[in-house]
């Protein structure tokens, strides 16, 4: 989100063990208060975060070690931190419009791509891939926002109602997302595409390879936001 520079913090890869840790971090009052101010500076009132789980990798090459990432031509978004991450893994990141990804996989223009399970299944990307690798490199967060001007004009009572409604919606959406991910995994497995869970050694190698990215993000975002989000993970 180039219009909210501090949201670059969400591009820090491989720092969470599970979704519970992600949600605990973004809901943490210290972190939330600081990132909320960044949204306000850009004209938004941040109410909370939902998510679609983690981003994972789909590929036609079996990944069983860190070295297996080497040389894979993977489609990414046009995001400098994403490009830096996959390059650090030894892959060949290739920015591409999402509308071209399915054909790119079909025609072997690219070897792999990365997205949350919901996107992989709803767009049938798994049909062109032999493996889905649970890299879980980034949480796929969804910002629940309204215009700051709109929010500020609301009576205090209505602001409280909006916040309460967001809390209910956030919890519901998280539960629905978890259930949906389980269904999407089942769909992928039934198709014959294999899901790979990485071992601890490979995960640690990915973290180690990300050290320079953590430093780049540290230099780009508010120090308080960085510390509250990263903790001692870097």
Language-model regions: role of each:
Residues 1-21, 30-31, 35-234:
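N-terminal secretory/targeting leader peptides
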């Amino acid at each position: 989100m180039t219009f909210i520079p501090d949201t670059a913090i969400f591009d820090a890869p491989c720092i969470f063990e599970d979704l519970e840790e992600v949600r605990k971090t973004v809901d943490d009052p210290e972190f939330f208060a600081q990132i909320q101010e960044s949204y306000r500076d850009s004209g938004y009132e941040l109410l909370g975060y939902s998510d679609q789980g983690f981003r994972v990798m789909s590929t036609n090459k079996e990944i069983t070690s860190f070295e297996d990432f080497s040389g894979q031509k993977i489609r990414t978004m046009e995001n400098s931190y994403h490009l830096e991450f996959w390059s650090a893994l030894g892959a060949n990141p290739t920015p591409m419009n999402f509308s071209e990804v399915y054909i790119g996989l079909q025609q072997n223009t690219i070897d792999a791509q990365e997205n949350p399970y919901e996107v992989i299944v709803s767009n049938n990307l798994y049909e062109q891939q032999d493996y889905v690798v649970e890299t879980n490199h980034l949480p796929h967060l969804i910002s629940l926002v309204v215009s700051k001007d709109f929010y500020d004009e609301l009576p205090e009572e209505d602001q409280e109602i909006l916040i309460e409604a967001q809390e209910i919606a956030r919890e519901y959406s998280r539960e629905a997302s978890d259930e949906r991910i389980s269904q999407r995994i089942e769909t992928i497995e039934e198709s014959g595409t294999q899901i790979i869970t990485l071992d601890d050694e490979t995960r640690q190698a990915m973290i180690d390879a990300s050290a320079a990215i953590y430093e780049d993000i540290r230099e780009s975002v508010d120090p308080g936001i960085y510390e509250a989000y990263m903790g001692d993970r870097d």
